[in-house]
A protein has these predicted regions:
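Flexible, glycine/small-residue-enriched loop-and-beta-strand segment within the central core
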Residues: 72-153, 178-188
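Active-site-proximal glycine-rich helix-loop-beta segment
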Residues: 144, 161-164
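Conserved G/P- and acidic residue-centered "switch" motifs that form tight phosphate/ATP-binding loops
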Residues: 160, 177
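Extracellular disulfide-bonded cysteine-rich modules/repeats
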Residues: 172-173
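Terminal amphipathic alpha-helical/low-complexity segments used for targeting or macromolecular assembly
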Residues: 1-65, 180-184
Length: 188
């Protein structure tokens, strides 16, 4: 299975069967992500060196204007798309099997978790996993320690303030709390 076939399968919404081809690809990609993130997190890198490592990790071209302060963690890496002028602060964790898209100008604060995987609520089926993409719009600011769950879209210009985001966020809106609730609209 190629990386593109993996991405296409994950976008299809079909289940991942334990021991199947996609599940085995998970393991392969996880091992590669562990190796690359250990390199990213293990020592200082110039911005140019870090950029090269991010392209290896994400398996695609990364805009030169993307910035990151390590450490950074991911358990897949190959299903993240990042736009121009995105900044990812220290301590972030991306669980990107379901797909993460971060549009241009977005700011991702310290210790943010983006989780595209869910487990079944029924204890008898809890080992099963479902996947849904996360989409972060243009010029979004996700503040420190926020968590964004599978299937969420955060609209352009929104601000997420220390929240657990379980539902879509409208553009130009500030949300906060657990679970995230609208605080106010942003006048633009």
């Amino acid at each position: 299975m190629t990386i593109q076939e993996f991405r296409d399968y994950m976008a299809s919404g079909k289940p991942v069967v334990g021991g199947g081809e996609v599940h085995m690809m998970f393991h392969q990609l996880s091992q590669e992500a562990l190796r690359i993130t250990a390199e990213i997190n293990g020592k200082y890198h110039t911005p140019e060196e870090l950029h090269t490592l991010l392209e290896q990790l994400w398996g695609r071209e990364v805009p030169k204007t993307v910035g990151m302060f390590p450490p950074f963690h991911t358990d897949c890496g190959k299903n993240t798309i990042v736009g121009e002028r995105v900044f990812i602060n220290t301590g972030c964790k991306f669980q990107d099997q379901g797909g993460i898209t971060i549009d241009e100008g977005a700011l991702i604060g310290h210790n943010v978790v983006l989780a595209t995987i869910n487990h079944d609520l029924d204890p008898a089926r809890r080992q099963s996993m479902s996947y849904a993409p996360i989409h972060i719009g243009k010029n979004v600011w996700i503040g420190a320690n926020a968590t964004v769950l599978a299937g969420v879209t955060i609209g352009d210009g929104a601000v997420v303030a220390g929240a657990v985001v379980t539902k879509d966020v409208e553009p130009n809106t500030i949300v906060g709390g657990v679970p995230a609730k609208v605080i106010r609209k942003i006048d633009v």
